[in-house]
Amino acid sequence: MLRACQLSGVTAAAQSCLCGKFVLRPLRPCRRYSTSGSSGLTTGKIAGAGLLFVGGGIGGTILYAKWDSHFRESVEKTIPYSDKLFEMVLGPAAYNVPLPKKSIQSGPLKISSVSEVMKESKQPASQLQKQKGDTPASATAPTEAAQIISAAGDTLSVPAPAVQPEESLKTDHPEIGEGKPTPALSEEASSSSIRERPPEEVAARLAQQEKQEQVKIESLAKSLEDALRQTASVTLQAIAAQNAAVQAVNAHSNILKAAMDNSEIAGEKKSAQWRTVEGALKERRKAVDEAADALLKAKEELEKMKSVIENAKKKEVAGAKPHITAAEGKLHNMIVDLDNVVKKVQAAQSEAKVVSQYHELVVQARDDFKRELDSITPEVLPGWKGMSVSDLADKLSTDDLNSLIAHAHRRIDQLNRELAEQKATEKQHITLALEKQKLEEKRAFDSAVAKALEHHRSEIQAEQDRKIEEVRDAMENEMRTQLRRQAAAHTDHLRDVLRVQEQELKSEFEQNLSEKLSEQELQFRRLSQEQVDNFTLDINTAYARLRGIEQAVQSHAVAEEEARKAHQLWLSVEALKYSMKTSSAETPTIPLGSAVEAIKANCSDNEFTQALTAAIPPESLTRGVYSEETLRARFYAVQKLARRVAMIDETRNSLYQYFLSYLQSLLLFPPQQLKPPPELCPEDINTFKLLSYASYCIEHGDLELAAKFVNQLKGESRRVAQDWLKEARMTLETKQIVEILTAYASAVGIGTTQVQPE
């Protein structure tokens, strides 16, 4: 508030000093008591004070204009030649160029096309800033609003107005200076008209563009999804084939180890075992071949998927980045899974290769040993060769055995020497092998690290792309919000201008029209007013009579209808009462369904009656209720049984307790009837007193109070009286509903009889 007051004061001072409206008036003619010297001194003081005030106002205006650019704009628009004063003192305004003044015309508004708006909106912010800095201010000032509004063209559904002077696009004129619009430009800008597109057209174009982009995004997402589905299917098949190959290689290795370990098995079993090994080898080769084929297919599909993703990136469809990022993540996961399975297959094949080499060495050693035996014992029968030593122990002679033992000693010595040499040689081989293994492991480790780094880099790149996309979306939303606000402000300004112009034109037209029509209207009113008054009076009189007749007839018909319904309801309720009271020894209860249906049929449009009839217990409708006489007769039997089991609580005590309770009922003689007190004490709440109170109430016709006393019973006495209490409750509920219906029917009947005389 203080700032507004200061602003208004400074503005007024600036207007007074710059426009020349502040006039120093001479003082009133004073009396001639003062000398001429004092008069000159007073005039000088006034002039000095005026100059000081004017200078202070100008200085304050300049200082405030330097601090607030909006105030400078308003002063430059309001006070002529103030812009030159500000430019001399403060310099040119930064990013603040006054729009050329032009008269508001009633012609259509001009607006830049959607294609121009979209082209300008797609420029990056850096280019826009560069264009703003390089282009002269007089050329960028008219198009600045169009650039601001065009950037929000994707989301706005309102027209994007913009002023497009013809000469504003010609930036090659050297006469146009920064911050100074030339007079020719101002005249041409003032003569150019403003055209505004209809909001429906702009909204339709934007909706069509959004629809096309959405269709492109959907088609791209569908193609990526189909390619991912196909690649995932082939990759899963390849992974399954690799797992099957691992299982086949491991099975063959296990069977081969078992065959080599069990060397003491008989011939037929051994041959069967080796046939099993051959079958496992065939299965292994088949599984490995299938795994290799599946791996090649999977690699081809992965390469195809990579090409599909690259093509999707090259299309540069707006909004498709999340789909591409998700597809890249899934592709990366498939590649990692496939690499892991391939590593498992390679490890299994390495282990199987070691087992195969071990088997070849064992077979070679056995063959060498057989050849040595053949050379040592040539006289041994051919049929004995190949048999075990235990089988040949009884068939060989002493010389043969001695020669075999001597050969065995020589062979052992030879093998010991070879073993020592082999140990020395193998130490060197092991050292070389360890170094070679270290190099191989280092290379494998380097390759694994490189591959892991590549996977990690791809994951980091995907995460970075996702974060960049999120930040870009947030910044675009913020930019669109700001641009939408500026566009809305510009649109509101144009709307206000058009509203003012419309009001001026409308007031002028209405004034002329009112002047021309006032005379004819007054004359026509004089002639028609009398006829209208007479006709209105006659119509009102006739209408009042007609309304009175209609109201009387309607009230009489309504009263008769209500009286008829009340009478029918009363008759139906009386029939229901009769059904409740009618009973015999053969039929103690009569179903009340027919009587209740009659009440519902007679009062089908009465919600109160329908609610009461719906509250009647269903068992009363189907079976009926016992009358009070029947309940009184049943009560005495229930009372007798309840007194017999008065000592039994809810836990149903032992048979001895039952006997004591029965004995108590025989020995005690409580009064059959006791008048219930106004308030029950804790001493009154026992089975005998409660039954005496209930008997008194039943004898005096108060079934409801008797049911309340019976409801206070506990233990076995309450269980004995449960059926009687249920029937009494049903009878009381039905009786209460019938009484309410009777009272309602009587009230409605009385109301209709009071309405009839009217």
Swiss-Prot record:
The modification Phosphoserine is found at residues 103, 112-113, 223, 388, 390. The keyword Chaperone does not apply. It is found in: Mitochondrion inner membrane; Mitochondrion. Residues 65-758 are mitochondrial intermembrane. It comes from the Eukaryota. GO terms for cellular component: membrane; MIB complex; MICOS complex; mitochondrial crista junction; mitochondrial inner membrane; mitochondrial intermembrane space; mitochondrion; SAM complex. The chain crosses the membrane at residues 46-64. Signal peptide: none annotated. Pfam families: Mitofilin. One of its GO terms (molecular function) is RNA binding. Component of the MICOS complex, a large protein complex of the mitochondrial inner membrane that plays crucial roles in the maintenance of crista junctions, inner membrane architecture, and formation of contact sites to the outer membrane. Plays an important role in the maintenance of the MICOS complex stability and the mitochondrial cristae morphology. This is MICOS complex subunit MIC60. It comes from Homo sapiens (Human).
